[in-house]
């Protein structure tokens, strides 16, 4: 299992500009042991080969991905409510991994797996085309300063890759409290053939009742921040990319 990110796998050149800054600190012995034990049970190692979800989850249920799950609130809530769906969470921060693993263990959820690695590389190298029913990216770092925009995780390249990973009719859900970021995402999506914006007004949708309002989101709402919810449907024919 990986405790620290490794950027060169099998001599492959990994991307240089990343959407995160490592804040992982030294762990206590107990936390290191917990992480080791439960990543073995609930984690998937990074590799440059596609994951067989039917084998990993021992069923053929739909797979839902959350990129950057934070404390794991949303991921766990969805997994508990949807036992006939499988959930994959990708995260790079150890505190987030620890929090989510505790939830998975507490509720004994067989339908959740986590990957401790860079989401862009996981999606590119580990997830086969036409294998995801839904993708969530909730409150990604907006990197508000112009000189940092290149660090944003949501790029045209990522959205094009996600489109190939989604099944026909699959959904991409994004939420942010940064209007500039939201508009940027809309502009990017407009230039990608294969997505339909499900907003009646061509921009944002109302938050679905089944999407848990996380602690992070609640704090923003208390401060008066507006939340921008985006939802897109894949109409891309993946048959040529299987």
Curated annotation (Swiss-Prot):
Any Pfam family hit: Methyltransf_4
Q: Which reaction does it catalyse?
A: guanosine(46) in tRNA + S-adenosyl-L-methionine = N(7)-methylguanosine(46) in tRNA + S-adenosyl-L-homocysteine
One cellular-component annotation, GO? tRNA methyltransferase complex
What keywords is this UniProt entry annotated with? Methyltransferase, S-adenosyl-L-methionine, Transferase, tRNA processing
Annotated substrate binding sites = 145, 177, 214-217
EC id: 2.1.1.33
Q: Name one GO molecular function term.
A: tRNA (guanine(46)-N7)-methyltransferase activity
The role this protein plays is: Catalyzes the formation of N(7)-methylguanine at position 46 (m7G46) in tRNA.
Stated name of the protein: tRNA (guanine-N(7)-)-methyltransferase
Name its species: Buchnera aphidicola subsp. Baizongia pistaciae (strain Bp)
